[in-house]
Amino acid sequence: MNGDLRENCRLLDEKLHRAVNPDMHVRFFRTFLRDAAVYYVDGLISTDFMQHYLLFPLQNAAETASSGEIAGCIRQRVALCEVEAFFDVREIVAQLVSGHAVVLADGMDGALSFDVRGAVRRGISPPLTESVVRGPHQGFNESIRDSITLLRRILPTPELIGEMRQIGDAIPVSLCVMYLQNAVDESSLSRLKARLEKVPSGGT
């Protein structure tokens, strides 16, 4: 990761599969008179904590900082978050999928990772209605967003893709097709998507 913010963002977008993963977010802002960006995974972080203790002090930093000073200035400005510097894109991605927010700034080599974790805390418990079924039992009863978060806690990898879709006409139903990019059988995935497209209105 070099000091080119646009190139670093392009690289992270690619590694996170942001084109299809709906919970991989980036927000652009200015700090120390420089363009900057913060990446995070929705559901794995506390957005209130990030806004108040990370973004607010950085967005209000109106001083100038050179390329060599910007990382140190950001560290000093954000006092209430654990922070660590990373320079390898794989390490940066690992920080993101573990619930950290990652800040990049134009002219700054690498990225700064801030611990702003705050996710759905319960484990995936066995569904009571399936107590006699053999095999692993894992039940989901939350919103789609929370269910995606629970899965990301189990499989902390950007290769876990979540494609949001809407099926049905009269009563549209939102759903998320989740799969491991590096393990899925593409033909089976295509057949699944085709069958979902054919679900009739009211048949969900």
Briefly describe each language-model feature range.
Residues 1-204:
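Membrane-embedded alpha-helical signal segments
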